[in-house]
């Protein structure tokens, strides 16, 4: 870290272990940042802080009216994904839960081929752009982007860029729980109009952006009734919004992948090179 800060010409201080010294260091760093009008770093070595008292998690700032959980939505979508299809999933709990479902299915012998998914861990808002690139490069392969409402808001320009390309082989699935669930449960900036169905904001955005086929579902029955898979005669990209609820109990048990991100990338590249689209 220190060599990187030095290379970037960023001033830094190392925080001492005593409380008074730590406070003084932060005051010095703040004063220097104001004086130079530049960022200043304060480095705290591992183990410098004592353990904090455990506090109860904050209550989520979202309603729980939707009957569909994220897992139920992912299970339903995966049932429609073909073996030669490619899936790009957004960061946070969505990718972790998708990974867990795939591992469970593979253990039972019913999972998809290894490398058929790319988990965008730590890359909030970039899943759609990656899916767009794959769909353009391999037009005969169906590509699924499993996105989140907070992630889509992060890089909303990709919505218009994707819609404008009119790719019939791209299915953009948005899981909308109205919050940034993976990072604390804060409500997203998307407005909610009590006079309209929950979730219509993003569906209207997709229509305005130019998606040819726009659908929404708030429960499993609605999702099952939708015929949103395009055929060779259809033109334009598909947008599907699924309203989900937050399930804190599920989040506590979500596994973290054993593989590295490089391993996921290599597996995805191998899949895309060798697995023929049908």
Protein language model features and the residues they cover:
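A short acidic, often aromatic-flanked loop/helix-cap motif at beta-alpha or helix-coil junctions
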Residues: 18-24, 48-50, 95, 126, ...
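Internal gly/pro-rich beta-alpha loop/helix module
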Residues: 1-38, 43-44, 55-60, 225-231
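Active-site glycine- and acidic-residue-rich loops that bind
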Residues: 16-26, 68, 150-155, 219-221
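Active-site diphosphate/adenylate-binding microenvironment
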Residues: 56-127
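Thiamine diphosphate
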Residues: 6, 75, 100-274
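Short, structured patches in soluble enzyme cores that scaffold and shape functional sites
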Residues: 16-17, 44-46, 174, 242-244
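Residue-level detector of anion-binding/catalytic polar loops
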Residues: 11, 39, 86, 212-213
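Phosphate/diphosphate-binding glycine-rich loops and adjacent basic-rich segments that engage nucleotide
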Residues: 25-79, 83, 245, 249-278
């Amino acid at each position: 870290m220190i060599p990187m800060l030095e290379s970037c010409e960023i001033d830094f201080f190392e925080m001492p272990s005593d409380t008074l010294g730590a406070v003084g260091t932060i005051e010095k760093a703040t004063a220097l940042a104001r004086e130079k009008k530049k960022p200043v770093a304060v480095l705290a070595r591992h183990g410098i802080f004592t353990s904090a008292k455990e506090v109860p998690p904050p209550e989520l700032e979202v309603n729980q009216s939707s009957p569909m959980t994220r897992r139920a939505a992912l299970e339903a979508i995966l049932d429609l994904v073909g073996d030669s299809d490619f899936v790009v999933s957004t960061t946070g709990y969505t990718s972790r839960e998708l990974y867990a479902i795939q591992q469970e299915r593979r253990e039972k012998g019913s999972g998809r081929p290894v490398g058929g998914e790319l988990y965008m861990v730590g890359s909030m808002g970039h899943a759609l752009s990656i899916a767009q690139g794959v769909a353009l490069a391999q037009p005969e392969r169906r590509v699924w982007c499993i996105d989140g409402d907070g992630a889509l808001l992060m890089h909303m320009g990709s919505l218009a860029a994707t819609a404008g390309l009119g790719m019939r082989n791209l299915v953009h699935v948005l899981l909308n729980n109205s919050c940034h669930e993976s990072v604390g449960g804060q409500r997203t900036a998307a407005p909610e109009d009590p006079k309209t169905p929950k979730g219509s904001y993003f569906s209207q955005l997709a229509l305005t952006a130019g998606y040819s086929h726009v659908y929404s579902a708030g429960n499993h029955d609605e999702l099952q009734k939708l015929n949103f898979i395009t055929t060779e005669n259809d033109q334009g990209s598909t947008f599907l919004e699924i309203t989900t609820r937050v399930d804190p109990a599920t989040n506590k048990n979500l596994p973290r992948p054993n593989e590295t991100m490089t391993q996921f990338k290599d597996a995805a590249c191998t899949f895309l090179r060798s697995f023929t689209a049908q």
